[in-house]
Amino acid sequence: MKRIFRLFVLAMMATAVAVSCNDKEDYVEPTLDVTPNNIAGCWSLDSWSGGELSSCSYVYIDFVRADKTYTLYQNIDSQYMRAITGHYFIYTDDEKGAIIRGNYDYGNGDWSHRYVVTELTEGRMVWTALDNPADVSVYIRATLPSDLQ
């Protein structure tokens, strides 16, 4: 009887080890709520509407949680770096989810789109233009290069 019990315990342990070592399941990073706290910090535009940025182009956006401001560092529309500042606002739409919008300082108006923010993790977020679902931007967590500061 003891032998049968030992064999049963060994079989259960082997089953537990086999199940716990299953590498087929990929780790899925948990998503975060879209809040000023969770998006605070520096992000780099990784792709835009499915395409990569050219090797000499960049977009960094640095969100400040405390006063809901941002600084956008980019050279998309110029050969030189431009620093653009403003305020951002996050609200929740019952159907679409978290939406971010913003305006530019010095009376330069609002962002051209409002964006639905999805797939926010510690290191990545996806923005989709509310009025143009084909306009998709993927941002990754980044450190602002010292030459841009």
Features from the language model and the residues they span:
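Sec-dependent bacterial lipoprotein signal peptides
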Residues: 1-19
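Bacterial Sec-dependent N-terminal signal peptides
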Residues: 15-40, 146-149
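Tryptophan-anchored aromatic micro-motifs
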Residues: 34-54, 88-90
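Short, solvent-exposed coil/turn segments at beta-strand boundaries
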Residues: 42, 61-70, 92-95, 117-125, ...
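Short beta-strand segments that buttress and anchor functional surface loops
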Residues: 47, 71-75, 99-105, 125-130
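N-terminal glycine/threonine-rich, aromatic-flanked beta-hairpin/loop signature
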Residues: 54-99
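Edge beta-strand at a domain terminus
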Residues: 83-93, 128-149
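An anionic, turn-rich surface loop/hairpin at beta-sheet edges
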Residues: 94-118
